[in-house]
């Protein structure tokens, strides 16, 4: 098999006359690199691309995807998980791994996912949508049931998710969640083990337990 690693946003600035030659690159276009422990400066990353453009697909990404037998998606975060990249590949007729664009979009929006579960009779914690201004946070912190979770609807990897232990922390959560933008929901907090069960087609894979970090 011939495989190359391509950054979705940075892409490949220089492509040989025959792009197929890239698939024979000795290192698979994967030089030594390290993952920083701090969040990147996204504006600096954008400026590092020659065109400095805001588009999600970097130079030559789609051209290389068209030439691949299959695209293995190793994306993380909203742009990679909300179905937009999957939809673009599907429109181009490019085979790819993972969930389709519709499933990705539904799962990424927590409010839509909750409504699907309720409609299908799948047990899910009590929840509700929140529409409020900063001046309402104090009142809401006294009215919402405790214990609860505050979430933005489109955050992944617990981004925009808050687990307040008391009403003072709940008020802070209601203020802080607004920085993530989009809609906000509250959800009944369930204590217990956290298990993830992936489903491929109609086949459920073995359960995997997520052990949360312990606060100092």
Describe the role of every protein-language-model region.
Residues 125-129, 148-175, 194:
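Glycine-rich phosphate-binding loop of ATP-grasp-fold ATP-dependent ligases
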Residues 77, 158, 210-214:
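Glycine-rich phosphate/pyrophosphate-binding beta-alpha loops
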């Amino acid at each position: 098999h011939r495989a190359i690693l391509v950054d979705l946003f940075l892409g490949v600035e220089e492509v040989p006359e025959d792009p197929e030659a890239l698939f024979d690159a000795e290192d698979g276009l994967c030089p030594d690199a390290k993952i920083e422990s701090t969040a990147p400066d996204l504006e600096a990353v954008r400026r590092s691309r020659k065109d400095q453009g805001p588009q999600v697909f970097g130079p030559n990404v789609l051209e290389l995807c068209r030439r691949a037998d299959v695209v293995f998606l190793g994306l993380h975060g909203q742009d990679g998980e909300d179905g937009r990249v999957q939809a673009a590949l599907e429109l181009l007729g490019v085979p790819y791994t993972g969930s389709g664009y519709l499933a990705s979009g539904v799962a990424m929006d927590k409010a839509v996912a909750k409504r699907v579960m309720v409609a299908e009779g799948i047990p899910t914690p009590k929840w509700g949508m929140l529409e409020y201004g900063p001046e309402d946070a104090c009142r809401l912190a006294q009215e919402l049931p405790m214990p609860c979770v505050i979430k933005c609807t489109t955050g992944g990897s617990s981004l925009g998710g808050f687990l307040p232990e008391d009403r003072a922390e709940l008020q802070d959560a209601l203020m802080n969640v607004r920085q993530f933008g989009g809609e906000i929901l509250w959800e009944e907090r369930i204590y217990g083990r956290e298990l993830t069960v992936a489903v491929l087609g109609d086949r459920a894979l073995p359960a995997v337990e997520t052990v949360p970090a312990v606060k100092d």
